[in-house]
């Protein structure tokens, strides 16, 4: 599954999806289920939980990867996205937040690295 916090994360989310599709992997995408409207995440949680691997694309403070990592047992690949304003620092806050997450087992890509996340997922899927 590919999960994105908001519509501003869509560019990176679609990069992940396109890269996986090129390699023959289809995946369900859940858009605009960020922590600012956590009720939207909860309404999709059962569907997200059906997947073996979850890629989370999130900007701002990047908390979505930690929240999903705390709720679900699957491997999580976090992709910080360079959206936000002020102290968000072009994705640095989202990156640092994901790296410092207290949810164990979250792997983190570099900022906006949707392709890298797709390739990491592909390695996991093919192993």
Region locations from a protein language model:
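Fold-independent oxyanion-binding glycine-rich loops
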Residues: 3-7, 32, 57-60, 79-82, ...
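C-terminal binding/interaction regions
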Residues: 4, 45-49, 53, 83, ...
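Alpha-helix C-terminal capping segments
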Residues: 22-23, 67-75, 123-127
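Glycine-rich phosphate-binding loop
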Residues: 43-81
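Short glycine/serine/threonine-rich phosphate/pyrophosphate-binding segments
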Residues: 9-14, 38, 58-68, 88, ...
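Buried hydrophobic positions in well-ordered alpha/beta secondary-structure cores of metabolic enzymes
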Residues: 2, 20, 55-57, 68, ...
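Structural motif
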Residues: 1, 26-28, 52-54, 74-78, ...
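Glycine-rich phosphate/diphosphate-binding loop of Rossmann-like nucleotide-binding domains
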Residues: 1-40
């Amino acid at each position: 599954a590919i999960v994105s916090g908001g519509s501003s994360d869509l560019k990176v989310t679609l990069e992940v999806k396109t890269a996986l599709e090129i390699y023959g992997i289809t995946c369900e995408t859940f858009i605009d289920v960020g922590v600012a409207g956590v009720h939207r995440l909860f309404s999709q949680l059962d569907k997200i939980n059906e997947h073996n691997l979850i890629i989370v694309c999130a900007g701002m403070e990047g908390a979505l990867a930690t929240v999903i990592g705390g709720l679900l047992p699957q491997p999580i690949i976090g992709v910080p996205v360079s959206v936000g304003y002020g102290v968000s620092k072009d994705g640095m806050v989202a990156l640092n937040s994901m790296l410092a997450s207290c949810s164990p087992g979250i792997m983190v890509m570099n900022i906006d690295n949707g392709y890298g996340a797709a390739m990491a997922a592909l390695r996991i899927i093919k192993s």
